């Protein structure tokens, strides 16, 4: 979608909220590659608990995405967004103070409870006209995906200067700036019908019935789960491989080129999304992801890890952008927040399950973890086996 198709007001809003959510995502993801290794320095740590510390963020994100989505449908997006971001800030401060693995798990859980991504997607979708939504959501999804991916490279550079503990403080400052930017610069025009309206259980039940009765919507939820399961599993493994090849401080040598190439790939893909090839691109992306993971079997080769990371990152960023875009395309306006809450919940359940499974199997079956991720990626192809985009 060319930016010239947006009005000045729409473009300013879109850029502001995309950058704000992108910075929030970057700050939250920056420490992710170091959680599995940092956990070893904490009291009572085990590989399984390290996996839980990495993945619990995704679990609480999953639990709270739907309530936050429903809440935003009733009282508006801005207040819910600000409330959720403040939860993240408190969680980061607790992580900074954590001396044992259990307190870190608690902190990560609290960070995840600020489940605002669905709210952000709903706000963007409701702020532009119908014909502009695919382009707007592609821009939002790409910025968030790129921010999350590039944070892995940025994180390794920052870690050369700061300890993981102090990185939590840096992330706190970044996210507080996001909170201020949303508070001061973004205004929401809420329909009067939603101001102060109580949450009606019948309306919520009807919304769930319509959404979950749509086969494509259900498959998109499964696609989101699979994509995030693989992503979180891969980012449990790669830092441990690279710790022996480049050291954690050298991870940028892998992630920086991977992110740059993935961004170029995503820019090319957007034009095909606008032409209606979203589902076919999902299939191709899962195939590329599976091939990329296959390169990780040669875990001692810098170049194999690099090629695998590039292919994986291309697949991940494309899927992260397309899946919510298609979901918003088929969801009705009146329960868009609920729809985004559901699909983001499935994504974050995947973010929780991926590292927990990887952590539980890691000490004895490293190759089995890779095989599981490849099989799951190939199963992801089945989620796009339909040509119908019936609205729900």
Tell me the role of every PLM-derived stretch.
Residues 2-10, 189-221:
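Juxtamembrane intracellular "pre-TM" segments in multi-pass secondary transporters
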Residues 58-66, 148-149, 259-267, 351-352:
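Residue-level signature of mid-helix packing/kink "hotspots" within the transmembrane helices
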Residues 63-99:
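Conserved MFS/SLC helix-loop-helix module at the cytosolic interface between two early adjacent transmembrane helices
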Residues 65-76, 265-277, 362:
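Helix-to-loop junctions at the C-terminal end of transmembrane segments
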Residues 107-144:
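Cytoplasmic helix-loop-helix junction between adjacent transmembrane helices
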Residues 116-128, 318-331:
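Intracellular juxtamembrane helix-capping segments at the cytosolic ends
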Residues 279-323:
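C-terminal transmembrane helical hairpin of 12-TM major facilitator-type secondary transporters
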Residues 335-363:
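A late C-terminal transmembrane helix in Major Facilitator Superfamily
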